[in-house]
A protein has these predicted regions:
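Aromatic-rich carbohydrate-binding modules that target alpha-glucans
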Residues: 2-50, 59-86
């Protein structure tokens, strides 16, 4: 399934989506920003089910998605969010 994600991070030089759907790979899913102060966006591929993810800002700070529920079981010890993907 393709899932769009949007993140506001004004002043950030880079934002990457990391999560169990990409094995927390810090290079697999760089986001694009539209305009100098626009939101960062990406569409990720994730199988149906529950996924845990976060945004990696400027290569050093993990931030949970403020638009999604927080994860309770943090396998990686980071603040993270939950993404539920349902089959069509």
């Amino acid at each position: 399934m393709l899932v769009p994600l949007v993140f506001e991070a004004r002043g950030a030089k880079s934002v990457v989506v990391v999560g169990d759907f990409n094995k927390w790979d810090e290079t697999a899913a760089p986001m694009r920003r539209f305009g100098p102060d626009g939101p960062w966006t990406i569409t990720v591929r994730a199988k149906p089910g529950r996924h845990v993810y976060a945004f990696l800002v400027d290569g050093s700070t993990f931030v949970a998605d403020p638009r999604a529920p927080r994860a309770r079981d943090l396998d990686y010890g980071r603040e993270a969010s939950v993404l539920m993907v349902t089959a069509p």
